[in-house]
């Protein structure tokens, strides 16, 4: 599991849910 992909997923989730 790549940390970069994890970071990208976190950004997407943050943008969608507004929970950062």
From Swiss-Prot:
The keyword Disulfide bond applies. It is found in: Secreted. It comes from the Eukaryota. Disulfide bonds join 14-20. Keywords: Amphibian defense peptide, Antibiotic, Antimicrobial, Cytolysis, Disulfide bond, Fungicide, Hemolysis, Secreted. Expressed by the skin glands. GO terms for cellular component: extracellular region. GO terms for biological process: defense response to bacterium; defense response to fungus; killing of cells of another organism. Belongs to the frog skin active peptide (FSAP) family. Brevinin subfamily. Antimicrobial peptide with activity against Gram-negative and Gram-positive bacteria (MIC=50 uM against E.coli, MIC=6 uM against S.aureus) and fungi (MIC=13 uM against C.albicans). Shows hemolytic activity on human erythrocytes (HC(50)=25 uM). This is Brevinin-1SPb. It comes from Lithobates septentrionalis (Mink frog). The lineage of its organism: Eukaryota, Metazoa, Chordata, Craniata, Vertebrata.
């Amino acid at each position: 599991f790549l940390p970069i992909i994890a970071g990208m997923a976190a950004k997407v989730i943050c943008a969608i849910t507004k929970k950062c």
